[in-house]
Amino acid sequence: MAGRLLSVENIDVYYGEFQALFGVSLEVYEGEVVALVGANGAGKTTTLKTISGLLRPRRGRIVWEGQDITSVPAYQRAELGIVHVPEGRGIFPYLTVYENLVVAAYTRRARERFEESLEMVYELFPRLRERKRQLAGTMSGGEQQMLAIARALIQRPRLLMLDEPSLGLAPKLAREVVYLARRLRDEYGITVLLVEQNVRLSLKVADRAYVLETGRVVREGPAGELEKDPEIRRAYLGI
């Protein structure tokens, strides 16, 4: 098995006095696509925010390649290669497509290989090359999502965390965006941690998955096995 990139070890996370995560643990190995699935409010987005450094756990650890990074600020985690595409895209609507990509290259690892990364994202998303002088806020929802992912790729991620990448997209485009996770792994060697509202689709794309309910990991295993599990099928797949 490839080396372990990330370990989340028994974390408790709060918003004020409200506890959102209860002893959550998970692992991500290099070259995997790992899915976090669960109902709205289960704690999936909170888990990603904690890994990226936007939230600090009150208990437990975040370990990256064997090093405890629990106290490392978010901007330094980006330098390590931990890159987060948040729900809602997070682009700059009044900048052009190209300017959005330039601004994304704020880490040293991104600046050093910007031109190479730019060609990579233009190959993945030819529409962005065509519209590089267009204001980002005037593009369609699907194009904005492409740009959000492209901005993350400019940062040369080793772990790319995608939070609800298909949200608000038409079904065909949503499927293409989610399957992009597998393409990034297969063609570019990028490890992906995926949160996706379409549980059926995310289990088809992922190698392994964790199921969260009310802030706790209640199931984990190979995605194909979870997809066939009667309880998962009944609770999340409507079967």
Annotate each language-model stretch with its function:
Residues 16, 72, 97-116, 124-129, ...:
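ABC-type ATPase nucleotide-binding domains, specifically the catalytic core motifs of the NBD
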Residues 37-39:
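The feature captures the beta-strand-to-loop junction immediately N-terminal to the Walker
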Residues 52:
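Helix-to-loop junction immediately C-terminal to a conserved catalytic motif
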Residues 60-67, 80, 113-118:
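Conserved ABC transporter NBD signature motif
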Residues 152-153:
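ABC ATPase C-loop
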Residues 156:
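Conserved catalytic motifs of ABC-family nucleotide-binding domains
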Residues 175-189:
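Helical segment within the ABC ATPase nucleotide-binding domain
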